[in-house]
UniProtKB/Swiss-Prot annotation:
Gene field: flgI
Name assigned to this protein: Flagellar P-ring protein
Annotated localization: Periplasm; Bacterial flagellum basal body
Signal peptide: 1-24
UniProt key word Signal: yes
Species annotation: Nitratidesulfovibrio vulgaris (strain ATCC 29579 / DSM 644 / CCUG 34227 / NCIMB 8303 / VKM B-1760 / Hildenborough) (Desulfovibrio vulgaris)
One Pfam family hit: FlgI
Keyword Signal: yes
Function summary: Assembles around the rod to form the L-ring and probably protects the motor/basal body from shearing forces during rotation.
Superkingdom, taxonomy of origin: Bacteria
Subunit structure, interactors included: The basal body constitutes a major portion of the flagellar organelle and consists of four rings (L,P,S, and M) mounted on a central rod.
InterPro entries associated with the record: Flag_FlgI
Molecular function per GO: structural molecule activity
Annotated Gene Ontology cellular component terms: bacterial-type flagellum basal body, distal rod, P ring; outer membrane-bounded periplasmic space
Length: 366
């Protein structure tokens, strides 16, 4: 009876999980299940085997770490005699999925924290990886893989990409898992990546339609709670696999995002502009500095005088008013392109439109 009920429930969910209208996305692409997330791990370690590109003697924490490591191995050393040029202190980071079990492997990122110039050819020594609770969840060790190189001589240096950050694929072994009673839940929570009341309500309605009952409800703009149907109690994987593939058409407020540092302008799909007349002319000011040298006449006992000379040139384009109106994104783009403005000019135009009340969208500057 149980397999029959499960098959019937899945057959109800599958049609609603098939591709829908244009603009629809899967729930898994805009939301995550509460509790199903990665955990950050971090550790401090030493990378050895560097060809003279490690930390300098001024990195006292590297020297101290080397002394402590050697003493634990039964080797007595004088800190003043250590030269850590082949060793670098590093921070090791990794992301552990909530479902990771002891024995599983994780990729780790190794980043220099001293004044080492390159980690090329280095080997990370055994490094405990701790969670936010201070407990050890894994151990990392292995040879580093870098995406660049660095070579230098006495008068020149060549470098490609960053050489102070490396990766060890599968370099960490999980020693302790995160306790999580996954299948014992009676209620699931979906967290939307972008808060929006319309999207949250739409997700709840799609879930209820898929499960054939009132199981889901929108708690707020970014949270949808769902009771687990009796057919899936103790076996949530089929339910969650079907839920995350249901498609919805996410909604969002109209927004214009501009980045003045790079001159990037991004217009959302629902951005609209009321009828407005725009005239935009660029003002260019050119300042040229030169030195004027005045030489005295021969045998006049005069002195050579150097005086600065400045030439300022101002040019302003004379452009006519143009009418712009955009009921759709394509019309808006065509109207703005007709002005012939550069992306940086467009930022000023959009700001002026917003101040005039013609731009019906949120203007965000990053």
């Amino acid at each position: 009876m149980w397999p029959l009920l499960l098959a019937v429930a899945l057959s109800t969910l599958l049609p609603l999980a098939m591709p829908g209208s244009a603009g629809a996305v899967r729930i898994k692409d805009i939301a995550t299940f509460s509790g199903v997330r990665d955990n950050q791990l971090v550790g401090y370690g030493l990378v050895v085997g560097l060809g003279g590109t490690g930390d300098k003697k001024e990195s006292v924490f590297t020297v101290s770490s080397m002394v402590n490591m050697l003493e634990r191995m039964g080797v007595a050393v004088d800190p003043k005699q250590l030269k850590p040029k082949n060793v670098a202190s590093v921070m090791v980071t990794a992301r552990m999925p909530v479902s990771a079990k002891p024995g599983a492997r994780l990729d780790v990122t190794v980043s220099s924290m001293g004044d080492a110039t390159s980690l090329l050819g280095g080997v990370l020594l055994q490094t405990p990886l701790k969670g936010v609770d201070g407990k050890i969840y894994g151990l990392a060790q292995g040879s580093l893989a870098l995406g660049g190189f660095s070579a230098e001589g006495q008068a020149a240096r060549a470098q490609k990409n960053i050489t102070t950050v490396g990766l060890i694929p599968g370099g960490a072994i999980i020693e302790r898992g995160v306790p999580f009673e996954f299948n014992q839940q009676d209620r699931l929570t979906l967290n939307l990546s972008t808060a929006d009341f319309s999207t949250a309500q739409q997700v709840a309605e799609r879930l209820n339609a898929a499960m054939g009952g009132r199981y889901a409800n929108a708690v707020d703009a970014s949270t949808v709670a769902m009771d687990v149907p009796p057919n899936y109690r103790g076996n949530l994987v089929p339910l969650m696999a079907s839920v995350e593939n249901i498609e919805v058409a996410p909604d969002a407020p109209a927004r214009v995002v501009v980045d003045e540092k790079t001159g990037t302008v991004v217009l959302g799909r629902d951005v609209r502009i009321s009828r407005v007349a725009v005239a935009h002319g660029s003002l260019q000011v050119t300042v040229q500095e030169s030195q004027q040298v005045s030489q005295p006449a021969p045998f006049s006992q005069g002195q050579t005088v150097v005086t600065p000379q400045t030439n300022v040139n101002v040019r302003e384009e004379n452009r006519r008013l143009m009418m712009i109106e955009g009921a759709t994104l394509q019309e808006l783009v065509d109207g703005l392109n007709a002005i012939g403005a550069t992306p940086r000019d467009l930022i000023s135009i959009l700001r002026a439109m917003k101040a005039a009340g013609a731009l019906h969208a949120e203007l965000e500057v990053i």
